[in-house]
Structure formats: C-alpha cells, structure tokens
Amino acid sequence: MTPSLVFLIVVIVVVEGQGWRPWDRFNHPGNFGNWGGNNWGTRQRNQEPHDIPPPVPPPGFRGNNDRFGGNIIKVVEIIDLGKSKNRGDILSDFKDVHKKHRHLGRKEWKGKVKQFCHRFPGHPNCRRGKVPDQKELEEMIGQFSKGGIGRFLKRVPKIYIEDPLARVDPKLKGFLENAGRGFGHVSSEHVNKLRDICKRRKCREQPESAKKTRELFTQKLADFETKIAGKDKTDSVQLRFDRTLQIKEALLEKGNLTADIVPVDNGVYDLDTMLTEEQANILLNELNKAGVGDDEIPLPDADTDDEDDDDSTNSASGAAPGSSRLKKSALYFEGNLIKKWDPSSPIRYVLDSSLEDLDKNDVRAAIYEIEKNTCIRFKELSSPPTGSHIVYYKVDSPTFCGLSYVGRADPANPVYLSFGCDNNKGVAIHETMHALGVAHQHLRNDRDQFITINWSNIDPQQYDAFVVVDSKLYTSYGVKYAYDSIMHYNGYTAAQNIAIPTMNPKTNSAVNLKVLGQRQKMGTTDIELLKKMYCQPGCDDKNVYCGAWALKDLCKNPGHDQYMAANCKKSCGLCAIGK
C-alpha cells in the first residue's frame, strides 16, 4: 500500500463536523458516513431519499451509483500537494531557498523581496527604505517564529461600529446577559482546560495538513477570481487568509492562550467558511486590532506599475489604496458584515465542469429544497455571468465536506464541495445557506442555554470553531435555537477523542445528540430564518438585538410591546407573511 493511500485512510476520521459522523463507528456500525462500516466504498443512493422532493425531479437524476471508486486516484492526487503549484506563497519560497542554501541572482532576489514586502509591509526588514540583502534571509524568516502575523500585514483599517444599545431603554439592556462580554470572550475555567490539553499534546506545531489546505484553496480562489477580474488576484487571496490567521491569533490572545496554542493556518474560519477582507477587518476591529500593521514603503528601484490597485488594499472603511491614515465609516448591523442577495431577482448559479452528473443532481436538489420552502429563486446558467453569482466546484478531498463564504461576496461566490460526505444534498444546502448569509447554529450568542461545550475534549488549535458570534453583528430574528438545524455541526466536531462529544444538548441529550449535524433536510427554523431574511421586503428590525428580545417574549410584554412593535417588526413576526 502506498504512503498516500495510507494517509487517505487515516485522514477520514478528521473531516469537519458536517456530514461525517465518526461516532457511528462506536454506536451505529455500518454507517460511517458513506465510506465506513459494511458498505465501505459503496455509494448507496437508495439510502439518501430526498425528504422534501422537488416538484419535478432535478435534471440528470439517477438511482444508485458508486462515485467513490472513480475518484480515488483524484483524491490521492489532491493529498499529494507537494507536487502542485505553490501559487504566490512567498514565505514558503523563502523558507525553501534558505533550506536548500540557494543563492538567487540580484534580479530574482529583488523581485521576491518586493513580493515579500508587499505582502508583509510591517516586517522590520521592509521598513528600512532599502532592499534587504539576501544575507538577511534567515533573520527575515525567523521573525515569524515569534508569532503575531498581524504586525507584519497591511494596517487594519479603523471602522466605527455603532453601539446598538446607545439609545435603548436601560431595562431592555437587562435582558441581554452576554451583551457586555464582547466577541471572543472565554472564561478562565475554559482557558485552564485548554491549557491542560496542551500539556498532553503539541499545540504549537502547525499541522502539515493545514499548509496543504491553504495551498489548495489559495490556488482555487486565485484562479477563480483571476478569471473574473482579468488580473492576478493571488495577493488579495493571501491577505484574506493572513487576516483569518490574524483573527484566530487575536482570539487566543484575548484568552491569554498565545503562549500555549498556535492556531491552524489553513485559510479557513470555523472549519467550513471563508472570510471576505471586509468581514475580517470588522472582526479585527471588534478584537481591538484596528491600526495594527503598517503601510507599505516602496522599495528603491522597484517597479511602480504593479498590481497594487487590486482590492487587497481596499478596506471596509473605504480607505483609499496606499492611505496612511485611518478612516472611519459607520457599520450598520444588518448591512455590512453579511451582504445579502437581491430578493427581487433569481440568484444565478453555475455548476462547474468538475462536477459529475450525480454531483450536479445533489446541488440541484439542494436548490430545489430551498426554493420549495421559501420565496428565494435561483437560475442555473451554463457559464459565469457578470455580476454576483454562485459557482459550485468539486474538490476531491477526504478532509472536508464543503467550504463557502457567509453572505454575498465580491466578485462572486465560489462554493467548494467534496461530495464525499454523508448526504451530499444536505451539505450543499448547508453551504448554500452560508452563501445566503446564514451562520452556524451552534455559534449563536444563546447557544450555552442549549448545549454544553466539553472544553476538555476540543482541539485547542481549532478554538475558533467554538467561539460564539459577535452579538452586535448577528441577529437571530427571533428564530428559536434548534438541534435539528441543518446549520448545526455534529456533537463530535473538532474532538480530540472522537468517542467523546464536544457538544452535548442540554435537553433530551441522548436523543438530540444523534440529531446534531443532520444533513437530511432543512429544519423548520432554517426555513423560518430564510423567510425572515429574504421574504419580507420593506419590513426590517431597527436594532440587532431585536431577535434576542423577541426570544425573551418581549414582543407582547406590556412594558416593552410598543417599542418592539415599532422597532422589531421582523423579529416579532409583524411583517407581511412571505412564502
């Protein structure tokens, strides 16, 4: 057996918490995802009925078919990323040059240094107004071992985030238990449990799989955006992934865990989502990182007609490229962090040629389910249009189920699916709902009322998978927490010991633990949320906390009903009923 195939078999158990259910090996033999138990390697289509069938069967619908066997070689090829194109990772290039004791010619060295200092303008060796000498290479690389990538990156723009409670009755504030904690709050008890874990395992070593994942999706995203923009977008993608790492580091810093844990640097946030630069900048502002980093100092004798005009230099604050001053702009809680699609026209989407017929059927079935239950409409196109749209890609990899942005992204939304997980239609629904702007259920601000996080069993390097969303930036719209939400992860997500849950339901735990992470169909609350987001035009909440107040039954509370009726129509269910 080849080393690559051995790795393939071993890595199956670490897929993130969507459709893979590793605990089935202990509780339900024979149903380990689609690849385990008695049917390993066999795709049983008749075990995946469409629970809410579309009015007309999706084009290309077929019955049983084995997809795994035909893709095994592709999977191994994806794993062996050492042979793939290392697109734009100048830091890896420098490490390779140093490791092999290569001496670069003057022109080649200048070109690489320019690329390095464009990506890391805050690096000390890029702040001297001259081209660093190649003899400084070891020093340049060594700076990164000290941690804190944010100090090397372009300055985080200052963004004014309005306090939604500034002009609210103090009595209403009393109903918000966690409002004052801020994004990234973690108790000292939980911090100590994470530290205890790191006494027994290595928490400061970057997993090799993380590097490969980042390389893979840097290439995928850069290819996707370059094709649309007509110019190389690698720098823009690298900055977004660097910002994602910066957020993970800032979250650990807030918990005083920097000395104990190095977060996974794979470009992915919360296991299956990507951040736009705008979203990353907003979250960094919430973590008090506004102004961290520096502005680029042009190197002498360097070309000036480069790609600095790409969107990697544009910030959520509206700062002009190259601006050395921090500018401000207001953040409206329902508008900026998550961009929604225009509900008055169909969302255009394309099924990339990388999808097989059965893969396309799964995506179409997912879209049919959303259409059947809501007012949202989609339109399939044969080729990418101009303007906003979704493109579904297949990435043959056993290490993930799906990956997407949360909300509409510019220039378009790529959705990456492996089609190797339990119930691929459900995974496609999950990722499409991310694209529509829906965050994970288990990261809601009220999640601790419904589930208990087992901090003694989570992977500390994937700490971001358990950080609740910022209460000032997300709203529930008054939709209740649901264990059967298709946006919930399974109870064993990011577990060290996959036989022990990382999330336990507080209600009817034995039954609901099996429900967590279901991908059979949209839950009733998923449908309700999408309807409130897209099917009630002209009716909005005026405060991001309306959802939380509605869940406290304040819509009919005699002391607050007038305020709620005037300011929280959507969360109180006072809008015209959409489909």
From Swiss-Prot:
Residues 329-536 form the Peptidase M12A domain. GO terms for cellular component: extracellular region. Residues 18-328 form a propeptide. Its main location: secreted. It is found in: Secreted. InterPro entries: Astacin-like_dom, MetalloPept_cat_dom_sf, Peptidase_M12A, Peptidase_M12A_astacin-9/10/11, Peptidase_Metallo, ShKT_dom. Its EC number is 3.4.24.-. GO terms for biological process: proteolysis. Residues 1-17 form the signal peptide. Keywords: Cleavage on pair of basic residues, Disulfide bond, Glycoprotein, Hydrolase, Metal-binding, Metalloprotease, Protease, Secreted, Signal, Zinc, Zymogen. Residues 293-312 have a biased composition (Acidic residues). Transmembrane segments: none annotated. Disulfide bonds join C375-C535, C401-C421, C539-C575, C546-C568, C555-C572. Glycans are attached at N256, N454. SUPFAM superfamilies: Metalloproteases ('zincins'), catalytic domain (SSF55486). Disruption phenotype: Defects lead to retarded growth. It holds the Pfam family ShK. It comes from the Eukaryota. Expressed in the anterior part of the intestine, CEP neurons and to a lesser extent in hypodermis. GO terms for molecular function: metalloendopeptidase activity; zinc ion binding. Residues 539-575 form the ShKT domain. Binds 1 zinc ion per subunit. Metalloprotease. This is Zinc metalloproteinase nas-11. It comes from Caenorhabditis elegans. The lineage of its organism: Eukaryota, Metazoa, Ecdysozoa, Nematoda, Chromadorea.
